Amino acid sequence: MKKTVERVISLLFVIALLTSLAVPVSAMKKPEFLLAIGDSITSGYGLDAYDESDPYSCGSYANLLATALSLEGKESYINKGLNGATSADILKNLPEIVNYLGYSDMIVFSAGVNDLQNAIPIVASAVAGKTVTGLSASIDVLTAAAPEKFSALANNQSFQKKIGDVLAKYEKNITDIAEIIKTNAPSARVIFLKQYNPLNNVPGFETFGKFADTLISSVNASMEKVCLSYGFDLVDMASAINADAMGLTNMLNYDVHPNAAGHVEIARAIANHLGISLDPAENTFDVETEPETTIEETTVSVELTRPAETEPETDAQTETTGCASSVSFAMIVAVACACIPLKKKYA
C-alpha cells in the first residue's frame, strides 16, 4: 500500500513538472482574416517600396501587424488605406469593401489626421484675422503667430463654431463607420487607433503644436466615446509617436506621415495591446482543441477536434501548442496505455 501511494505521488509530481514546462500560449486566438481601414498612414504612403496599387511590400504598421499574425497580403489580409482620405471619405467608401467586413475577424481603423489638416486654414484665418487659403500659406501664418494669438481663439465665437462643426462631423462619421462595421462584422475584434500629434516638440512648431494638441485631444475623445459605445479596442498610437515626433515622422520634410521607425512603433503598440510579438516566430496562439475520450472494453478512443482548414496535428504539434490541461491529459492517457491498448483517431 505504501509503495502504491509513493508511485501515485511520483506520477503526480511528473505531471506537475511537465505542466510547468508547457510552452506558454497567447490568450488570443489567431485571426483568420485582417482588414486595415484608414488613410495614407494605413496604406504606408512615403515608405520605401510603397506602391499605391500594391501596398503590401512596404513596412507599414498594417503590413508589420499582418506579418506578426502570419497573414498573407491579398489572401488573409487586405489593406484599404486611402491616401488623403478624411473620415467622410472612408465612410463613403465603406460600401465598396463591405464584403471584406463579412469575413474579417480582426479590423484595424485609423482616421483623423486629414480631417484636422483640412481645418488648418480655419485656424490660420482666425489667427490672422483675415481669410487664409491653402495649407502652405496657413502653415506660414501659424508658425509665425505669437502664443497670445492662439489664446485669443478661446473667446472667438465664430472660430469655435467652425472648428466645433469640424469635430462634430468627425465624431458622427466615425460613429457611422463603427455602426457599419458592427453590423457587418459583429464578432470581429475591432481596433481603433488614437491619433498622434506630428508637431509635438518639433522645432518651429512649438506654439501651434501645443494648440494642435487641443484639437487632436478632441478627436481622440470622440474615438474613446465610440469605442466604449461599440465595445471596440482603443490602442494609443499617439503615445507611440508623440514621445519623439521629430524622429518618428517625416517632419524634417514637413510631412506628417510616420517614417519606417514610426510605423514599427505603431505596430508594436498594437502588438503589445494584443499580447503578441512583432516576430511571428515568437508567437504561439490559442488553439481551441477539446479532446473527447470514450472507453469501450479494452480500447481507448481519442477524438482531437481542430479548425477545419488546418492540417491534422501530430503529437509533436500538440505538445508545442497545447495548454497545460492537454499535457496533464496526455500523461493520464500514457499511464492508461500501460495496461490498455490505445487507438488514436484524428478528426
Question: What do these predicted ranges mean?
Answer:
Residues L47, D89-D165, N197-P198:
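Oxyanion-hole/transition-state-stabilizing segment in secreted/luminal serine hydrolases
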